[in-house]
A protein has these predicted regions:
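Short, structured segments at the rim of ligand-binding sites
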Residues: 2-229
């Protein structure tokens, strides 16, 4: 029971809330965004380098951290931060998206960019949504070797991606396109950036702070992204 409302089922699939005669004010802290943090971690995996991700709940990142570590990315936890590093070659792995605490479907497009550059053959299986591989065609234009087989996508790792003009078809696919553009050789353009801006606050500014060469072209909703040097 609670002095605000009565509830049953916390920690199960069903929560029942029983109304009360009167509610009163309170304070609630919104949890950090697991997917935004994971997106920057995936960018480190794809591009290399080092990033300190602050203001998170590391336990909420466990499934993402575990997969990146399988791929050879170093992740060190301290309090509410994760230090993410990648210097060597990426290793292959398989990923299946599941409801929390499994690997999040909203991280599927971002980690696939890293899998495109991993040695060997990797597989991603989408266990939550249908038709979530629309972005694959954009990655193949950049040189990725991917084939879709039902709910799974199979990746044959390549040495590098090549710059291209690509589209963001939705929020997370758009983030994946930005990561791919940062990892690719040459200058890329990503259009339909309104999808990306809907879910990432000041993504261009944050990436610039990390050393990315990225500019926004407001007139046609395009961002131009150059490889991190």
């Amino acid at each position: 029971a609670s002095d605000v409302y009565k509830r049953q089922g916390a920690g199960t699939d069903t929560i029942r809330i029983f109304g009360v005669d009167k509610l009163h004010g309170g304070t609630y802290a919104i949890i950090p965004d697991q997917i935004e943090a994971g997106t920057y971690m995936a960018a480190v995996a794809a591009c290399g380098g080092q990033v300190l991700v602050r203001g998170i709940i590391p336990k909420h990142m466990d499934c993402i951290t575990a997969k990146l570590q399988e791929m050879g990315v170093q992740v060190e936890e301290q309090d509410d931060t994760l230090l993410v590093r990648r210097s060597g070659k990426l290793r292959r792995t398989n990923v299946k998206t599941l409801p929390y605490p499994g690997f999040p479907t909203d991280m599927q497009p971002q980690i696939t960019v890293a899998l495109c550059l991993a040695e060997g053959t990797s597989m991603v299986t989408e266990g939550v949504w249908d038709n979530r591989y629309r972005y694959v065609g954009e990655l193949t234009r950049m040189g990725a070797q991917i084939r879709v087989e039902g709910r799974s996508a199979v990746f044959e790792g390549v040495d590098h991606l090549t710059a291209a003009s690509v589209q963001a078809y939705d929020l997370r696919a758009g983030a994946a396109m930005v990561i791919a553009a940062l990892a690719a050789e040459g200058t890329s353009e990503v259009s339909n950036v309104h999808y990306i801006e809907r879910g990432y606050e000041n993504i261009i500014g944050k990436l610039r702070n990390l050393g990315a060469q990225i500019d926004s072209v407001e007139c046609d909703e395009t961002v131009e992204t150059r490889q991190i040097g």
